Amino acid sequence: LSEGLRAAIRVGVGRALYRGGIVETLLGSIDARGVSVDSVLSMLATCFSRSVAEKLNVNNIEVVVELYEDLDALLDGDVNNVNRLKVKIRVEGATREAVEGALTGCPFYTMLRPKIDLEWG
């Protein structure tokens, strides 16, 4: 937390225990070699789609999260801006504005928003 007196409540927790090549998580045991960037991005897509589906009461939504590295930022030595996420969303029966509003209620989206390029359709 930042400077000064602040109040905070825990809204979630993740746990992982690595032991002998196996990672034990709240979702079960996973072979550590099976954990990849793609699996983490899939979990982010799951969080985003759930947030939109629940807030907008829609049943058909597709979310794709892609990780990109900005080579210009890398070459410029701007390591804080090298990684970017592209989030592509398709939702039937909802406007772009409604979807963006629903995403702002997702804590992961809010934390990562400065690094996200949102695409519609």
Task: List PLM regions with ranges.
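Extended beta-strand/beta-hairpin segments
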Residues: L1-M43, R50-G121
